[in-house]
Amino acid sequence: MRHTPRKRFGQHFLVDTSVIAEIIHIIHPVPGDRMIEIGPGLGALTKPLLNVLDELQVIEIDRDIVDYLSRTYPGKLVIHNIDALKFDFSELGEGLRIIGNLPYNISTPLLFHLSRFSSLITDMYFMLQLEVVERMVALPSTPDYGRLSIMLQNRFEMEQMLVVPAESFDPPPRVQSAIVCMRPKAEPTIPLKHERLFAELVSAAFSQRRKTLRNTLRHYLTADDFERLEIDSGLRAENLSLAQYAAIVRQVYEDRQ
């Protein structure tokens, strides 16, 4: 099929066969897997996955690609013609394995959308902009550590698996890409009942990265609170571990009761 990649959908089609083979090896699909592919494009991963799987669910917003996939892979392919940001993944049950070459223009909101369904997910493998993957897996006190790191690390264990050069795509993106593996934790570090407060505190802490916690969290914690938590209020948001954010969330939650 000749298909002109659509800029508004952020389409960059994976065409490097050696990279495709390596990704399939990393994912390691087996018969019986409940696999969902987001943004299958022209089927670079779809075809080798269907060689193994009994059924593959795909989510694709581009109507032309949906028509092509329907004609090319009848039978074992179940196609959802919808924006992945609007898809209710709970409709597909549990034990989900989700993969995809995610459009870079919606990757961050899509990751947060998928986080809502973490209890139903076994693992996820995504092709993303390398810079985004580096932020996802970043450690405290490093330049890439920020809101994305903390919010996702609360729910997932994550690992950067493979760097993919721009020339592996058609058209080549202006950035390097990478595969990231995401596995949900048995229990989030910060309980889901506190997630709204957690997000509020993290946003406040990172609202002015150059300022100290004494300033950014002044509406949430007193000097005595910082001392009780054994957290230096002269630190900045990027210096705190997830465990320290969990302690802050507990303190603020208790203060509000």
Curated annotation (Swiss-Prot):
This is Ribosomal RNA small subunit methyltransferase A. It is found in: Cytoplasm. GO terms for molecular function: 16S rRNA (adenine(1518)-N(6)/adenine(1519)-N(6))-dimethyltransferase activity; RNA binding. The gene is rsmA. NCBIfam families: ksgA (TIGR00755). It catalyses: adenosine(1518)/adenosine(1519) in 16S rRNA + 4 S-adenosyl-L-methionine = N(6)-dimethyladenosine(1518)/N(6)-dimethyladenosine(1519) in 16S rRNA + 4 S-adenosyl-L-homocysteine + 4 H(+). It comes from Nitrosomonas europaea (strain ATCC 19718 / CIP 103999 / KCTC 2705 / NBRC 14298). The lineage of its organism: Bacteria, Pseudomonadati, Pseudomonadota, Betaproteobacteria, Nitrosomonadales. Keywords: Cytoplasm, Methyltransferase, RNA-binding, rRNA processing, S-adenosyl-L-methionine, Transferase. Pfam families: RrnaAD (PF00398). GO terms for cellular component: cytosol.
